[in-house]
Amino acid sequence: MSTDIRSKFLQVYDTLKSELINDPAFEFDDDSRQWIEKMLDYNVPGGKLNRGLSVIDSYQLLKGGKLTDDEIFHASALGWCVEWLQAYFLVLDDIMDESHTRRGQPCWFRLPKVGMIAANDGIILRNHVPRILKKHFRGKPYYVDLVDLFNEVEFQTASGQMIDLITTLVGEKDLSKYSLSIHRRIVQYKTAYYSFYLPVACALLMFGEDLEKHVEVKNVLVEMGTYFQVQDDYLDCFGAPEVIGKIGTDIEDFKCSWLVVKALELANEEQKKVLHENYGKKDPSPVAKVKELYNTLNLQGVFEDYENTSYKKLITSIEGHPSKAVQAVLKSFLGKIYRRQK
């Protein structure tokens, strides 16, 4: 991804933000305009922007040539819709998880003047997506498919979040409920669809493709998303907080993490007892005991094996696709996440 494309992408953010804070559907005064602007700047462009930039990247690989300014603008606008959706999920997710930091700074709802106003801000972020789509894509033949796609993916993500939340209900902590199949369901719906399938699906629609004919592409991307989340689970415990931008809390939050599922699979009865007694406790001492057990079970080595096997399987699936352009899109995606440290 050239720095030129990245800077053009960031310029499109400024354009979209300006349109939204001057939206004629609402009579903004200075206070509300400033609030929205601050809220957007704090939550939307702060991450790595991988999802958004992937729309441009994927479209470029499908087209196989230089993009016109118009194509760059439209691919960027779709990329920002993905980033807006992500911001909406994260703002609300942080409230639900009672998180403290996100992308190396305090979560939005933790700011003194924000608090629970963040819940409404999340709703506003979500409502910005159809406004961007309507303004810039209404005349396109694929407009309805785009709206459907974003609605579908939002539903899948919210449903995945629900499984995640009800599996970790306080007072009903039961590790025996956790398995690889539950983990996979949460990951597939909560992360894989919006982080992996959505950006590529946007590029395919923009390129004039029918998504119904690309079920195999969806399957590969969902697999990739699963692999990505396993990496995330691993980094939550073994990654350096200053590198990943947050302090991992999966153990304290009783999350159905790949690590705990694997630990339950590999542990003997005595070790399982340690997990049952310490997993999901907020104090540093039980957390340290869980981490110690993870080291005893060599989960770092188990993860390395998983990473290598997953990579080989994904490459085989990708190379089975008839279109070289689609292969390039999928390989580009995989290249961005293979062996990542954050």
Swiss-Prot record:
Q: Which GO terms describe its molecular function?
A: (2E,6E)-farnesyl diphosphate synthase activity; dimethylallyltranstransferase activity; metal ion binding
Q: Where in the cell is it found?
A: Cytoplasm
Which GO biological process entries does UniProt record here?
cholesterol biosynthetic process; farnesyl diphosphate biosynthetic process; geranyl diphosphate biosynthetic process
Residues given in the record as dimethylallyl diphosphate binding sites: 102, 190-191, 229, 246, 255
UniProt: isopentenyl diphosphate binding residues? 48, 51, 86, 103
Q: Which UniProt keywords apply?
A: Cholesterol biosynthesis, Cholesterol metabolism, Cytoplasm, Isoprene biosynthesis, Lipid biosynthesis, Lipid metabolism, Magnesium, Metal-binding, Steroid biosynthesis, Steroid metabolism, Sterol biosynthesis, Sterol metabolism, Transferase
Kindly list the positions annotated as binding Mg(2+) 1: 93, 97
Q: What does the record give as EC number?
A: 2.5.1.10, 2.5.1.1
In terms of superkingdom, the source organism counts as Eukaryota
Q: Could you tell me which InterPro entries the record lists for this protein?
A: FPS1-like, Isoprenoid_synthase_dom_sf, Polyprenyl_synt, Polyprenyl_synt_CS
Free-text remark on how the cofactor is bound: Binds 2 Mg(2+) ions per subunit.
Family annotation (Gene3D superfamilies): Farnesyl Diphosphate Synthase (1.10.600.10)
Q: Pull one GO CC term from this UniProt entry.
A: cytoplasm
What is the residue range of the signal peptide feature? none
Catalytic activity from the UniProt record: isopentenyl diphosphate + dimethylallyl diphosphate = (2E)-geranyl diphosphate + diphosphate; isopentenyl diphosphate + (2E)-geranyl diphosphate = (2E,6E)-farnesyl diphosphate + diphosphate
Top-rank EC class of the record's enzyme: transferase
**What is the required cofactor set for this protein?**
Mg(2+)
CDD domains cross-referenced by the UniProt entry: Trans_IPPS_HT
Q: What does this protein do?
A: Catalyzes the sequential condensation of isopentenyl pyrophosphate with the allylic pyrophosphates, dimethylallyl pyrophosphate, and then with the resultant geranylpyrophosphate to the ultimate product farnesyl pyrophosphate.
**What family does this chain come from, according to its entry?**
Belongs to the FPP/GGPP synthase family.
Protein name, per record: Farnesyl pyrophosphate synthase 2
| Species of provenance | Parthenium argentatum (Guayule rubber plant)
